[in-house]
């Protein structure tokens, strides 16, 4: 049996369900960033984590190998959906200002080599897709158009995998560029072919979906009382079978996660960041 190691972020006191054949081991590590951490983003090689405040003000990074924390920007919205370049040496992100009551975003680029940043796009009221500025292959939910923009090697198409009139979020392409996972606001988490065909329902609650390889997706499964989130735990889904494995329990409220290859990092409502290693058998 081939054993594949996946590194996941998790909170202390959590446990994995060993009844699922794919999970064989787990341990937990807390990452001390010296402040509250929310909305994590991982570099392509999994060495650096971007994080921000609960309301996305400011953008910081931590190198998981050296534990060095760096302040990238302190302006509003800087932590909303930042994107690494392919080699991980730079990050592209937005900041926000208000002019005459209208929010306007600009785009900035930060270098981890020079530790400097520069504005690469002036403030505009238009919607900015940072993914398109760092990659030619990506997927992006166009909420206003009720579609998903899929770009493969720079060729862009708009698709509606489960039909028109839906609000698509958190679209992500599998590492082998064959599958697409996405969330629909009211319908849940789905997987489809890259052209949107053969869409398959995975679960009714699946926020922040991330591919850990070509076969497994992790996501946040939440519950609410109609007003606020009351519980949130990380689940792993085998996309071929739809089998769901709970990786954490309800003891800690998770508010964000990110995954790259063998690593997942997530944060809690208290602003804590954790790393958890598990083994998944294929």
Language model features by range: what are they?
Residues 5-14:
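Sec-dependent N-terminal signal peptides
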Residues 20-282:
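Sequence signature of WD/YWTD-type beta-propeller architectures
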